[in-house]
């Protein structure tokens, strides 16, 4: 969070640049974006939407990264269940 010295907009750009490299097919990047960025800016809807998109995308969207994508989906499912812990 900004109040603790972070820069959410710089983080957003970094996440977006990283996701653009694989056209969003490397799901771990999107999962981490959802988990860290949207918590930092206190955006519950963005958090829920982004993690659900990770879950809804087929893991084989990037065949060479299927295992990483499956792990991203497992994490996204867990993080969705934790939403009430992070947002009021």
Predicted regions and their residues:
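Alpha-helical adaptor scaffolds
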Residues: 1-16, 23
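Short coil/turn linking the two alpha-helices of tandem helical-hairpin repeats
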Residues: 1-5, 34-43, 81-88
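TPR/TPR-like (Sel1-like) alpha-helical repeat modules
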Residues: 10-12, 45-61
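Conserved structural position within tetratricopeptide repeats
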Residues: 16-20, 56, 63
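Short coil loop/turn residues that delineate tetratricopeptide repeat
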Residues: 23-25, 60
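Alpha-solenoid helical repeat scaffolds
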Residues: 27-32, 64-67
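Terminal, low-structured helical/coil segments at or just beyond the last alpha-helical repeat
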Residues: 60-88
């Amino acid at each position: 969070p900004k109040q603790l010295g972070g820069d959410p907009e710089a983080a957003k750009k970094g996440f977006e640049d990283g996701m653009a490299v694989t056209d969003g097919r490397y799901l771990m990047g999107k999962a981490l974006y959802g988990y860290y960025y949207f918590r930092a800016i206190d955006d519950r809807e963005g958090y829920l939407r982004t993690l659900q998109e990770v879950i809804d995308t087929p893991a084989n969207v990037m065949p060479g990264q299927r295992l990483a994508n499956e792990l991203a989906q497992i994490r996204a499912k867990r993080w969705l269940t934790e939403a009430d812990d992070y947002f009021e």
